């Protein structure tokens, strides 16, 4: 029992590091960029404390440096710091660009997840409304009484027979067929500045092609966010 770790999650490890090294780590607010190679410094400084393992430290560092508040702190002119808060050199431009790309992709994933969740909610609400049973007739309400004296109904002219009209296709089906889009199978046919769609669940978002790369297409959403999307998520 003595060898069991006291800190069971990466969040608990981050809270411990923020308390142990307050000039380097923070539990809330904007985070400071960390020194390159700080993992080895952590192993040497906290080895044996709280029964922390290298795996726990590595997982906590990965979670800390991928958080939005840390990525916001990686900007031009910022200084990296060591465990004691001492500056260890200014951030390079390539590191700043990489952090911005990670932040934009994370925001785009959250936006796509929200759009998919909203689509599922609307679909579930439609199914629930369609399955709702009709309300029963209120108790005590009787059908309309027949005419007194059993009088025969007035002679009425038979209605002229009308030709059956062909069933009209529902408007929703027509709109759906009109809005059906073609998936992108060859990204080499795309052009810079071309308007396309980015599929997110059952909905699609407007986007503009910024760059065609080997691993996908870099696009800019209508919200201003830029991200790299694989071909199977693109539509004309």
Curated annotation (Swiss-Prot):
| Region (Disordered), start-end ranges | 105-185
Q: Does the keyword RNA-binding apply?
A: yes
Q: Entry's InterPro entries?
A: ProQ (IPR023529), ProQ/FinO (IPR016103), ProQ/FinO_sf (IPR036442), ProQ_C (IPR035236)
Question: What's in the GO CC field?
Answer: cytosol
Chief location: cytoplasm
What SUPFAM superfamilies does UniProt report for this protein, alphabetically? FinO-like
**Protein's name in the database:** RNA chaperone ProQ
User: What organism is the protein native to?
Assistant: Serratia proteamaculans (strain 568)
What does the organism's lineage look like at the top?
Bacteria, Pseudomonadati, Pseudomonadota, Gammaproteobacteria, Enterobacterales
User: Gene name, please?
Assistant: proQ
């Amino acid at each position: 029992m003595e060898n069991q770790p006291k800190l069971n999650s990466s969040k608990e490890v981050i809270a411990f590091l923020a308390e142990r090294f307050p000039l380097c780590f923070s539990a809330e607010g904007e985070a400071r960029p960390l020194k390159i190679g700080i993992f080895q410094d952590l192993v040497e400084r906290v080895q044996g404390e709280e029964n922390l393992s290298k795996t726990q430290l590595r997982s906590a560092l990965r979670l800390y440096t991928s958080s939005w508040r840390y990525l916001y702190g990686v900007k031009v002119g910022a200084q990296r710091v060591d465990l004691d808060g001492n500056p260890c050199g200014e951030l390079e431009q390539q590191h700043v660009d990489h952090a911005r790309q990670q932040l934009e992709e994370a925001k785009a994933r959250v936006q796509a997840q929200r759009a998919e969740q909203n689509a599922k909610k609307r679909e579930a609400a439609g199914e629930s409304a369609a399955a709702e049973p009709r309300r029963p007739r209120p108790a005590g309400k009787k059908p309309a009484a027949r005419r007194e004296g059993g009088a025969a109904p007035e002679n009425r002219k038979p209605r002229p027979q009308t030709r059956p009209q062909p069933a009209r296709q529902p408007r929703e089906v027509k709109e759906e067929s009109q809005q059906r889009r073609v998936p992108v199978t060859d990204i080499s046919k795309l052009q810079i500045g071309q308007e396309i769609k980015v599929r997110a669940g059952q909905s699609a978002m407007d986007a503009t092609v910024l760059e065609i790369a080997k691993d996908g297409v870099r696009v800019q959403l209508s919200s201003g966010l830029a991200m790299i999307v694989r071909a199977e998520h693109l539509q004309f």
